[in-house]
């Protein structure tokens, strides 16, 4: 049974982009970041990925002597795209799994890293984006990186934070599955070339 709130984005005969949610159709040209090839499509993140919001533990529920599974508390755990494990908990409640893309959403926002170690509890400063359809996770991280500036600009409150809806509503350009890895590979090559150029100039 199809979700009545399912979002379907399509290009009309007038070359404008529209989104259909239930029986409502509206023009979303202002939300479309760029044109895409004919065999690509735009889709909201919530249609293909699961978003898991973390929950804080009390001091009595975690430790630093590796008792239990890792406890990821926030941006302090993120180092150059990797996760440092410094706390553990024997009573996890909200669990990230290996392969999830982890994103900081409170305080220092927009830090990202893949879960490469397995089950861990995440605090409320962290969201886990879970790939439920076997798409290319690295491609997803590149898409979110494209929006990082916009995501940070949307952060609200005395302690900056982004909401679930900020992430779930992101409009992503999705190429055919076999093309996603090619896009990732080409961007990696371009980034490496830029790195070499910057190093040669410094």
Task: Give each language-model segment a name.
Residues 145-148, 152, 191:
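Short amphipathic alpha-helical signal-transduction/dimerization elements
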Residues 73-75, 87-147, 163:
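A short beta-sheet element
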Residues 80-82, 112-113, 137-138, 181-182:
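Short helix/loop capping segments that flank catalytic or ligand/cofactor-binding pockets
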Residues 1-2, 58-67, 154-157:
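Short coil/turn segments at secondary-structure boundaries
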Residues 21-31, 46-61, 68-98, 123:
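Sequence-specific dsDNA recognition surfaces
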Residues 120-127, 156-178:
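A short glycine-rich beta-alpha junction/loop motif
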Residues 1-24:
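Extended, domain-scale alpha-helical bundle/helix-rich regions
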Residues 19-20, 24-56, 169, 173-185, ...:
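Non-catalytic DNA-recognition/assembly elements of restriction-modification systems
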């Amino acid at each position: 049974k199809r979700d009545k709130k399912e979002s379907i984005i399509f290009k009309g005969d007038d070359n404008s982009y529209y989104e259909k949610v239930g029986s409502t159709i509206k023009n979303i040209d202002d939300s479309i970041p760029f044109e895409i090839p004919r065999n690509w499509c735009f889709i909201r993140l919530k249609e293909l990925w699961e978003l898991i919001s973390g929950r804080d533990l009390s001091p009595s529920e975690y430790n630093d002597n590796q008792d239990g599974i890792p406890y990821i508390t926030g941006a302090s755990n993120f180092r150059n795209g990797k996760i440092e494990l410094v706390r553990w908990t024997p009573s996890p409640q909200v669990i990230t799994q290996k392969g999830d893309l982890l994103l900081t959403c409170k305080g220092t926002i927009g830090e990202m890293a893949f879960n490469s170690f397995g089950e861990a509890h995440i605090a409320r400063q962290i969201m886990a984006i879970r790939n439920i359809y076997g798409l290319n996770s690295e491609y997803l991280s590149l898409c979110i990186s494209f929006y990082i500036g916009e995501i940070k600009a949307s952060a609200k409150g005395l302690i900056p934070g982004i909401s679930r809806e900020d992430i779930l509503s992101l409009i992503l350009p999705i190429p055919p599955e076999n093309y996603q890895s090619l896009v990732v590979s080409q961007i990696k090559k371009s980034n490496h070339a830029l790195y070499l150029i910057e190093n040669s100039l410094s």
